[in-house]
Amino acid sequence: EADEPLWLYKGDNIERAPTTADHPILPSIIDDVKLDPNRRYA
C-alpha cells in the first residue's frame, strides 16, 4: 500500500502513462490527486 502512494507522491511520475495502464485503479487515484493533493488516499 505504501509502495503505490510513494511514487504517486512524486508529481513528476504522473508523466508515466505506461505505469498507469498497468494499474487500472491508479488513474482514478491520480485524478483525485490532481483535484485534491490532500486526498491522495481517497
From Swiss-Prot:
Tissue expression remark: Hemolymph.
GO BP terms: defense response to fungus; defense response to Gram-positive bacterium; innate immune response; killing of cells of another organism
Keywords, comma-separated and alphabetical: Antibiotic, Antimicrobial, Fungicide, Immunity, Innate immunity, Secreted
Entry's family note: Belongs to the lebocin family.
Organism: Galleria mellonella
GO cellular component, one term: extracellular space
Name listed for the protein in its UniProt record: Lebocin-like anionic peptide 1
Induction: By bacterial infection.
Keyword Secreted part of the UniProt annotation: yes
Reported function: Antimicrobial protein. Has antibacterial activity against the Gram-positive bacteria M.luteus (MIC=22.7 uM) and L.monocytogenes (MIC=90.9 uM). Lacks antibacterial activity against the Gram-positive bacteria B.circulans, S.aureus, and S.lutea, and the Gram-negative bacteria E.coli D31, E.coli ATCC 25922, and S.typhimurium. Has antifungal activity against A.niger (MIC=90.9 uM) and T.harzianum (MIC=90.9 uM), but lacks antifungal activity against S.cerevisiae, P.pastoris, Z.marxianus, C.albicans, C.fructus, and F.oxysporum.
Subcellular location: Secreted
